[in-house]
Amino acid sequence: MSSSKIKELREGLMSSSKWSMAPGMMMQQNQPRPATTTPPISRGNEDADEGLNTARSFSSFQDLKGMSGDAKEQESATLVHLTKGRAHPRSRRPPRQISIDSAKKEETKNTGSTKAADTKSSVEATISPLKDTKSPSNASVFPIKPTESKTSTTKDSETAKEEDDASSSTTKAVEATTSKASSAHTDTLATSASNSDRGASTPEMVVKAEKREGSTSPIPYSSLSIAERIKQAQNTPFLESKVLPQNNETSDEENVDVKPAAGTVKNVMQAFLQPATPAKDTASKEPSKSSQQPVRTKPRIAQSPFLAQDAKENGGNVEVSSPLSFSASKSPAAVDSSTKTPTEQVNVVSKQAPTTSSTSVISPDPLQTAAPSANVNEVIASLESKVVTRRTGSGNNYRVGLRNVSGSERTKSLSKESPVEPEKPALPDATSSSTPTTENKESWTNQGIKSSQQRSANASPATSPSNQASIHASFTKESSTHSSPSFTLESLFSGAPRVVELTRFSQPSPACSRALLARWKEEYRTSIH
């Protein structure tokens, strides 16, 4: 607030101290106003001009002593309506309301052109003094007689006449003062606007200078102007936050996990988690990898035959980062991550969970640790359950992994495999409730559930069997009726990753693991602040 405005506010309050009220108090409805209260010291950060208007209307209120509290409240309600809802409940402007009533009366009384013109000017006169910022006390601007208080309730013809005389007599004087005041007002507005422009432009220039120098240190967020902050927020992609390694460690493992090379399974997941970033960003950040990492307008989906083919080539041992078809380049990063031992990967997952990085680490492959020569179908199922799924909008192709395999083959192979589940003594009801039907989608949904159940038994032995059983029951009961298991909160936070068939209303959801959820929350928080 400028100092001149503050001065005016103070003057207005001094003139109307009789009618002002304690700071921060709002008038309750149908409550008569107290006769004397202390003037507000400061109204906090509320609109300053609202305060000015309040002061002015209070000063004009001193004459309206005949009104009861209810009538005043009614009047204030109509006033709020007239001023487009901007007015405080306590900024009452009776002159405006009364004059409009009188104008209507005048028009009904006689329809002469001169009278109509008079009415117009009187209405203007009574509306415009609200903008008056110069006069110390507005009692002179609104010469309202006590008899006028009747006009709102008893609409007598005599009071109307009196009111007309009063308004027409002061019209000229009022117009003179208001024109002066309004010109001053516009001047102050112009100066403040230019000032704000200047203020906004300075941090921008600083940003540009820093960019020219090539320094990596960002400008503190607090020093940016609001426009600059908005621009910054629009330019940064949603999940790409600054990667802060935990405990100031910068090891190769972390770098591999944070920015995987193009063509790894993790990179496919990253494509689903991240919006398409413009090409110039990747180029400026890492010129070395910009050639390998294709800029995607839409997240590209890995076609399933390639997954199957990779599984066959690797002898069933599917690594976390097996190169997919759409990028043939095997970068050193991919080799690094594939040569890691399973225990290392587990460590990376646990260490990386709370940090803010743009990739999703989904729990290490149990097939890698448990059975190196697993069957191809199991491998595909587990891989499929790991890849983040997303509804792509057209039709029902929201499954990532196995979309293009012909249905009959898939059903045959899966129904052959799935009933054999010797590894789960903790879940007696699993095989009975989720034996696959002949229907294509249901059978492989059940298979996915079972494989993920098995994986959860491997990955998180800490989960209690009863908890797991209840989760499993909630899944299979649903999937036996219509192949889209709803995941409950319990299943969401149970620690084990789950295959979730997307229903119509669900968001793009990964296989829900606790680490991933925590990471998303963290990234969202950092992307906001």
Curated annotation (Swiss-Prot):
GO cellular component assignments: cell division site; cell tip; cytoplasm
Biased segments, Polar residues type: 27-40, 110-125, 170-199, 237-249, 336-362, 430-455, 471-488
Entry-annotated residues carrying Phosphoserine: 128, 217
Places the protein is found: Cytoplasm
Superkingdom per UniProt: Eukaryota
Composition-biased stretches (Basic residues): 83-95
Region annotation (Disordered) ranges: 1-222, 237-256, 271-372, 393-488
Keywords: Cytoplasm, Phosphoprotein
Major site of localization recorded for this protein: cytoplasm
Low complexity bias (residue ranges): 321-334, 456-470
Compositional bias per record (Basic and acidic residues), positions renumbered to this chain: 1-11, 409-426
Protein name as it appears in the record: Uncharacterized protein PB1A10.13
Organism field: Schizosaccharomyces pombe (strain 972 / ATCC 24843)
